[in-house]
């Protein structure tokens, strides 16, 4: 039997989706399908063709196809969902949650129909609630539905630490727990540079400033851009997750995972350290937390549950 080429479908051809498609292709993780709604078919096909025409220059042997038909995503190994709307002025959080949940359900139905054995990675905000929605709608086992936020938050934290110490980002490690943004919980005790704890290298007040900048990292970029939000780092984070699954790398990275008792939580998707490999989320890693860290995590959990409460009834 012939060996099958890997296939990755990216749902949503905006800045993040298109950049993810390009990065996945550049790493030759498989053939890529970029999909958007019918009235975006022209721009989606145009972006895909432009990317495809760059592959000979880059020495990349991945195909990239633009489409509005889910039939073209058939038998995908991994599906990345970036589709959804951003919060607009005057829009309530509940409206955002309801609108994007409706989009998630629509997308998930098609994914289940055409790629019933796929792994799904969800980026759409609010990511914890949207990942939960996809999980419930798909009926897939929990290990095959994964959310992205912690990889990005950790990358931002590592970037700022490396800048502070003037060292390589490759030597900086760290973990972020909880929800995305203001309520994330950076675990300083588990963060280091070259194996040396950050508390030995950076003054406590400066660490807190770095943590606060990390929490506001997305907003900082929104403010600088003036129109739009981050997409290079989110796309790189998604690509790392796709690679971990398709290459069975068993990376220890923070993802949004379904909890059934871990960290004292049940029936909740939350950002936690996980082992990500060929079977998706293969293990949730439970870290020992101080009372202060537990209190911070509880606050983050409550924020996530408040958002979940805005999900429309089944």
Curated annotation (Swiss-Prot):
Pfam families: Ldh_1_C, Ldh_1_N. Its EC number is 1.1.1.37. Keywords: NAD, Oxidoreductase, Phosphoprotein, Tricarboxylic acid cycle. It is an enzyme of class 1 (oxidoreductase). GO terms for biological process: lactate metabolic process; tricarboxylic acid cycle. The modification Phosphoserine is found at residue 149. It catalyses: (S)-malate + NAD(+) = oxaloacetate + NADH + H(+). Substrate binds at residues 87, 93, 125, 156. NAD(+) binds at residues 12-17, 36, 100, 123-125. The active site is at residue 180. Belongs to the LDH/MDH superfamily. MDH type 3 family. This is Malate dehydrogenase. It comes from Shouchella clausii (strain KSM-K16). The lineage of its organism: Bacteria, Bacillati, Bacillota, Bacilli, Bacillales. The gene is mdh.
